[in-house]
Amino acid sequence: MGRKTIIRLGAGLLAVLSFASEPAAATKLQPETIEEFDRYIGSSESRMDETVASQRVFLWIDSLAEHDRVLEEAKLRRGQVLIRRLETGNSVDGIHVRGGLIHDWMAIVFIPGISLSHTLALVQDYDHAAEHYSPEVERSKLLSRSGNEFRVFLRLKRTEMLTTVFDTEYDIRYVTVDTSRAYSRSHSTRISEVADPDTPREHEKPIGEDNGFLWRLYSYWRFEQVDGGVYIQCEAISLTRDIPPGLGWLVRPFIQNIPSKSLSSALAATRKALVPEIPRVSSLDQRQEPDLAAAMARTRN
């Protein structure tokens, strides 16, 4: 290893250690950032309400042209998790707002041979969520329940060059549309970054005065029992800090990749928990041609 390489590695390590330390990496969540996030959420939830009320586009694949829908459904039946960005604008980092970034991703998976009631029983078992969603969920606890409304605690672990741990709480509400469809809305009510986790020095950083890797996390799940199984769709909208000048190479992978990876991982873990014997499909399987004749013969409600 050459001297220049050693110097570059040393400089990179120093930057990582410096950024992860307090207070060097700290940023502050501003009121105007919260206002813009809340405005985006209001617009997004209005869009979601319209799709539920229309009864025509419950899942994102319902809005596709027939040929495209057939192709996507064939991928789902091979066990793939389909994911896409819903963000607008040209930035690959997310939607720029004052003092932060909004990330909006949607994913869907199909799980054969299960029922809607079976699915809801698993996703509502919050005391055991850490067992199903490890390693990203390290701890979980149902704080309270009143009918279809839940208060939940999750300790989250995010790793992408940097590893960050968060203690988070959510208000979650489930709604039954009919005998085959349901949806839920989950709003984070408290997110605190944990410093020195699982050590005697463990403590929470002041809320909104941390590395800024996760300030808000709202998720919207939809469940539809049809075609001999259940489609599960989730849209996740999160708020993070903006990319700090000069440290894009370090911070951008975390802020840019974690939202989509976490969502895809959550749906894959849900599928595995519901039907453990189903093998995972690698990305190489995406090159296989679907059975279009069989898929075209199927008509969704």
Identify the residue ranges that each predicted region occupies.
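N-terminal secretory signal peptides that target proteins for export/translocation
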Residues: 1-5
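Bacterial N-terminal signal peptides
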Residues: 10-20
